Amino acid sequence: MSLKGSLKLPAAPKDKVRNITKFPVLVEGEVVTNYAQKDVRPIFQKLSYPVFIDLSEGIYLLEKLNLSSNSLIEVTSLGHLNKLKRLILNRNNLIEYSVQGLSSLVYLGLCNNRIDRITDMSDCKKLINIDLSGNRLTCGDGFDHFSKLKSLKVLDLSSNSINCSLIDFQKKILEPLKKSKTLEYLSFENNLIEKKYEEFRLFVINELPKLKYLNWVLISKDERTKASKLDSEGFFSKQLSILSVTPVVHNNNNPNNTVTSAQSSPSLSSVSTPIPTPLNTSSNNIGGGGSGTTTSVSVGSSPTIRGMPSSPNSRSTSFIQRKPSVGANMMPKLNSSLNRSTDFLGKERENHQSTSPSSSSLSISSSSQNNNSNHHHHHPKSIDETPEVLSPFDILQSKVNAENCLSSSQQDLIVNHNNLTTASQILQEIKPTKELTKQETEDYIDILLNELQPNNTDFPTFASVIDQKVYLDLLYRAIIEDAIPEELIEECNKSTTTAATAAAVVDFVTPQLTSLSSSSSSSSTTPPQPQLPPPPPQQQQLDLSLPLPPVNIINMPMDDDELISVPTDESELPVVSTIVPSLVKESSRESLLVTTIDNSTLSTTPPLSSTTPPSPSPKLPTLEETIESVVTAKPSSTTTTATQTNKVSGGSAKEIWTKIDQNTATTPSTPSKNLPKRLPSQSNLINNNNNNNVINVPPPTQSILKPVVGGGSGSTPSSPQMKPMAKPIAKIPAVSTTTNTTPTSTPGSPSKPIMKPVIKKVPAISLKQDQPPIVSPPQPQPQPPIVQQKQQQQQQQQQQQQPQQHFKSEIDKALADIDSWGVIPTAPQAEIKKPIIPQELLSNIQKVESPTEMVENATSKLDEMIMEYHNTSPTSSPTNTRKSITPVQQQQPIQQPIQQPIQQPIQQPIQQPIQQQQQPPIQQIDQVQRMINNETNRIGSMMILGQNISLPNWIVPHDQIQVGSRLGLGSFGDCYTGNAFSIPTILKKLRTQRFTDQFLGQFKNEVMQIRELQHENLVPVSGCCLDNNIYIVHPYYDASNLQTLLFEQSHNNNNNNNNNNNNNNNNNNNNNNNNNHTIISNEFIHRVSLGISKAMTYLHSHDVVHRALKLNNILIDRVSGNVLVRDYGFNFVKDGIFRTGQQSSPYLAPELFNSNCNQYDTNSDQFGFAMILLQLFTRSPLFQDIHVSRITDTILNGVRPEIPDNVPSVFSRLIKACWSADSSARPSFLTISKILSQPFQRIFALSPSTTITKPIVSTGNTTIDSSSSSSGSGSSSVVGSVNSTTIPPVNNSNTGSTGSTSATVKHQFSETGELNRKMILVLERIVSMLSTAAASASTSTISTDSIDSIKRALKALENLSSPENHSSMVGIGLMRSLCFIGTIHLAEIDEQLLRVIYSLSTNEQLSNEFILAGGFTPLSQWVSSSSSSSTSANISLLAIKLLTVLADEQHLHHVRLTGILSSLTQQFVNYTSNNQNGGGGSGGGVINETIILQSVGAMSRILLNQDNQNQFIEEGGVSSLLKMLLNSGNSLSMRALLALCCLISNQNCKSQLHNAGIIPKLMELLSSPQKLLRLHSLKVIETMSKDIEFRKLLIQDNCLSLLVNLLLNSYNGTNTGIGNNTTGNNNDSQESICSILSCIGSLLKNQIALESFYQSNGVDVLIKLIGYNQQIEILESLFPVYCLLINHEQSRLKLVPTINQLVEILSNSTLKESIIISILKCLTLFSSHSSCIEFIEQSMSVSIVSTLLIRNENNYEIKIHSLRFVSSLAKVNNKLAVNIHMMGILQTLVNNLYDKNSMIKDEAISTISWLVSSQECRSIFLQKNVLPMLFDFLSTRNVDIMERLIWAISFFALDDSAQSLMRDNQQCIQFIVNCLDRHEEVFKTLSIKTILILSQKQINHQALKRVGVDFQLQVLSSSSNRSIQLASKKILSLLS
């Protein structure tokens, strides 16, 4: 947001204003000419945004300034940098920038910002290159500034928003560019206008004949000829004339484009794009993919909202963005009521579909031809119909239809009660809950809500008679229990109803509640019978002769499945149901994903049979799933095509309250196109046993969910045939020639839905006992593409033609079977429910003797056969067998010969291991490895680094490697795309260059070991390439790393475009959804963490340490969603890089830094794993407030990132254990994998320690402790679950009195999930009431009933509109309904409506919804209401308050376009004119004054927009504000001052403000006795001082003198306040002093101001403010002014005595870091002047600084400024070197030579160079071996450091011992001689001096001659510098 002209920071407190910051200076007092991006990085990492930079000091003579990538929003007031040549501001968030005064500017970089207009560049006469690419430039004003640039050659306008008509483009852009005669390079690339017009490039070439390059492509002669030809033929003029007659209509600029098209063309439905959520993704898969778009009036939208424009995302995010409710099952006492449905949309939707079946199809837009063809074969009657795409409302409606459906025989029993109008009629006919029809319930609740009378018509926004949470609870109970609670009736009686009426209602309701409770208790023992839900709309016209009972779908967790298969007869296959979306009841947003039932392509209609439950017997309590019966089918002998579907409509009156979590399915005919693949865990069909013994209790500690796989014809109810499922073989892939595996799921589908566990008693008997037959429908076989179908058909024909193949040996036959594994077509495999295994049997699972040994024997035999085959085959290689033993094939069934022993019945159950995640595409990996082997065997041998050796099969020749583009950086190499043998691969190029024989041998050994590691969660190593560069070859993966998924939001935003552009291709649409839309959900976190732990467990089991485990090394496959770990192994390379570069990574364990990578083990990887886990939850960088160079020290000091409270307990404790400083205390990855393999619900439960203390409920005179209350049934707690917390009832039903809830109860209630659940229900009811009333108002005159309904809905919203409830109101269409009601403008509800909108608009998301719904349109009418009545004035006042809230910068143009700005300006003009004429009524005057106050306050925000400023100035608003500034009312003057502050920088009114004498008026306000006026005037002066012209005017008007007087008065007030102990006065004076000092600091940037300030005795006042006990806030504002005055000589002489005070303040150990740094800066400035050295020496400042260096060893800022002070002292006067030595600073300097921070290292070198001039310090440095340390830095390229080094060496040369060290170090001598070649005189002088000293001794001559010093000296002997010439000749004579 641009804050131009405003001191107020957005979303900050009122007293929060801009903080001025300065760049650090290497040496204080020296001129700075260049600031690179790395130089300014520390200041941006330290301070919080926004950062405001002051570069106006004289020391900043910048020629280059690079502020890229710092999120800056405004760069202005750079005019004083008149020597600046290069200004680089790329990759920021700039909206405002100013280059005025930059007369030397040559290059201006502004790419990738948010600039939408060009500012004045008239001062930049030398500007050559401008980069404005990647901004938001349109065809607006500002391009004429280019015409003033006489030197412009390069202009880049690519990737902007230029999309205007060709005439405007020519007039506003090309015409100014024509005036720039030097323009040669121009780019309009990636602008919409470029592709909008024909021959656009030729048009620009014709308009700009001097242009050489357009879009960075050379303009050829042919293009110029063609452009001239088109111009001569009149082509361009014709285009311009056509455009001038027919203007271009930009549909993208019309926010209501969809609605407009829908209104203009009734036959076309307006298409709205759903927001990409898991719901949209799931709905696209339903019905074979479906269309990617929805309609504006679709089946999923609420049928009650008619006549309102449909918004694309009205409800699409309401379920997804809502925070998960962690306490969905926290109240066991409400289980009976919570199990009932609370949705009110189902019946109306059902009636709507049944009464007008054709309307549904008309409201759905036509789909693509692909979808039509998919349904053509099986649905001849609905060829033109398309399956609808489900929005979140559709999903909710499907849930209601699935739960409340009725059979056809029960449909006749429905009675509609549409004429019920009063509550008394409903109460007279009230029935128990189970007997109410849906329509009766909805009508009753509607009237019940309408009759809840408010307590007060003027109900406040955030207050109510009843607490809002209690009110919501009562309202929720009224809806759930079909009765009005007594408390709510009592409150209603207080407002409108009489006591007699209330008593009658209570007397009638009480028996009804009794009947309801009895009905509820009886329903707990007899579960409701599921009914068949209605078919989808497109299938309602079909009919099926035989209705099918429903089939229940239970999604079982993959890791908990145990499959025990049964022999299946392939001739008998059951019928499969079609897709029915259903919701899984769970307390997270992932639970709202739609689950579906896949279809098989079977076309038979067999008779049905149902399974029977087993006879009751003693059972053990075992956790089981609540399921429905499964239908079995017997196929008929003939095959027919199902063409009809049973018509089902209506619902049973007894089945209204069907449980939400029961999933049912319909059985319409099957579509011809198969659905996308789904995980096996999503398609298990479970049989339902008797549910009579089902009891709802909290779940036990461990859940055992065990489905069973299918039965065939041989299975009977008394004797089921089962076979054991052996443990998957490790080395042999499972293959079956007769069966097929269950198709896997597409990525992104939910693999572990949450299921409601119940206790079911299972007989503790052996498995020999007879079991009932369990048959489940098979899963559909995915239909392959056409090419694959043809290939499979050909293979099947070949197999039929050759049924028997003759093999020469058993080995050939086995290998033939292996080769045919991937192509053999298989049939679907049925799965049935597995019998429950008692817990005690599981303990003996290791003792079971199963046929698994036989499988292992067969496997080993097959291994021997394969080895024998390879031994006899000369052309095969060991890698060729890797495909057959890859673990990815383990999930396939074992080959038939091996499968025979398994089919025998077993005596004991065999536990199946946890299923692994989906494997990576290993076929591509094997292809790479196979090609490497084959090609290397073909080549045989080659030259590798000059050695003729035999080439192993895993080494790729360098001529077979093609290196592509670079992907990124790794821990020890760079990754590139490429090809190996023309196969896409990933190539990692090693960053090391040490290609010794030892290194190559170690590397090849590592490759041979690493390539043997094969795991599903590892990126394998296929081979390597040894050439001049070393490459590691990996298979190519289409994957994203975890760093990108967590921190780059653009990865998630691409899904919208993919859905819009790929509606005609279902497969592409699904792939794009999966590739570009990754939700960081709990499911995702669990999958990633478990995948990493499994991979690391495998690596550690092979003694491989990763040592670089971080986000970038974790890949997520875009196709399969599999988790892959890369960059493992090769630790000898990583250690070498670490030791040389000293990497500082937050993922490295402390022992890696302590031991310098010499001692670490596998436990080091757990540290990086902990950091990854933390970032999965926080989605933020680690140690983001700490400089990267200090991360290592931070970790070594035991500091770790903070773990948020929302991290589950399991993960929180796991993170803390993994990042323990003691590596032996960290858990192994095997333990971690076991922890993460627990049930999903358990590991994501909150910590038991976070449970809330048992609340105390006060009911009348009795106090009840909830811990001893017997009302809750869930007394048994569950470890790790929040279900152990019991919420007591609100009132005591025994006493019948209303309970007063304590604060503890309300706090607990707000933290549970019940509040969210009830809030959703009530808000849906409120939105329905508002929408119904709005729809009736749009069609006819609104009735009184509708107005009353709106009033009651608004009243409920007022009670619920607290900030904590705002999140539940986002995305439900509430603000759109309120906006639509506002357009009606009903006088009865406008004031109440405004109050509600104002309270809700305090939430940013809700305010944006209101604006997007067109909220400024009704707001403009409310603002302009000018009636004299008090009601109208109140409405206008509320509207202006609402405008103040909505006036955000991105929406300010709406204020101008809707006429609000003009209305407010006219109010100002009228107000000021009436006051001058003495007008204004007595009664309305006060109201008008209040309205004007609010209007002026809102104007201070509206005028932040430049266009708004211009219109306000044109309409005469400035003069009105100036008149208000002189108003006697302080409030109005203050607000007018703030509004004028926004206009100060506007060029159109700058002269007007100056001529109006605003500065003298400000001076008058500064003298005002009102403190508030003075403070605001100071802020305005501070803002004005940033403008050079106003700054001069303020100084001329003696503003500084006035400020000094104010400062003195405030200082005296502070002293008076302290003496009298008046804290309030003291605080007021402190605030005034800080504001005055800020203004003075802004004005003192001018040298003239320094003299004026000195003459005003301002320095004397500042000296009074300096003291040891001075307040920190005053000191922070004082020292910036203090530093400015040190550069003024006269002021410095007065300030020098205060050095002792500065040092005294510095000695305070509790001083803030910012104050310490400021004082060090001041002392450094003093030390640069020799006149101040004496005071510094007397102040003992060196001793204090020495203490600071020791105390703040780990503080980067204090350390660097302390070293600068010491360096400055040593530079000016070496007499202080003795003091520096005595204080022990020399050792600190030596220690800092190898500091990790380069700036500290450089400063230490600089300080040492100044100190070596002292003989005593030089001797100490030689003793500490400092000179050889300096030799290590001789290769630096830093010119300043090179100068310091040659300076130090020239003094070290004076000592004989140092000469010996120099003589023995040839690099040192070479460095000295090389300095003779530099053009800087200082280098030549110091080098000549050093050589002259060394040449004095004969022993040094040989070393000097060895580096060629003779030649250099002969050149310098003819130098123009007389001194250098004489010295060179003298040295030559000595050397000769």
From Swiss-Prot:
Molecular-function GO term, any one: ATP binding
One CC-aspect GO term: cytoplasm
Residues that bind ATP: 967-975, 988
Keywords assigned by UniProt, alphabetized: ATP-binding, Leucine-rich repeat, Nucleotide-binding, Repeat
Residue span(s) of domain LRRCT: 191-230
LRR repeats: 61-82, 83-103, 104-125, 126-147, 151-173
Segments of this protein annotated with the region Disordered: 253-319, 347-386, 516-544, 599-620, 660-689, 702-756, 769-809, 1050-1075, 1261-1308
Pfam families: PK_Tyr_Ser-Thr
Start-end of each HEAT repeat: 325-368, 439-476, 574-614, 617-654, 1317-1356, 1512-1549, 1553-1590, 1598-1635, 1690-1728, 1739-1775, 1780-1817, 1821-1858, 1863-1900
The Protein kinase domain, residue ranges: 961-1241
Bias type Low complexity, positions: 253-285, 293-302, 353-373, 516-526, 600-612, 736-756, 786-805, 1052-1075, 1266-1282, 1291-1302
Superkingdom classification of source: Eukaryota
SUPFAM superfamilies named among the record's database cross-references: ARM repeat (SSF48371), Outer arm dynein light chain 1 (SSF52075), Protein kinase-like (PK-like) (SSF56112)
Bias kind Pro residues: ranges: 527-538, 774-785
GO process annotations (BP): signal transduction
Biased composition range(s): Polar residues: 310-319, 660-673
Residues making up the signal peptide according to the UniProt record: none
UniProt domain comment: The protein kinase domain is predicted to be catalytically inactive.
Protein name per the record: Probable inactive serine/threonine-protein kinase DDB_G0278909
Lineage: Eukaryota, Amoebozoa, Evosea, Eumycetozoa, Dictyostelia
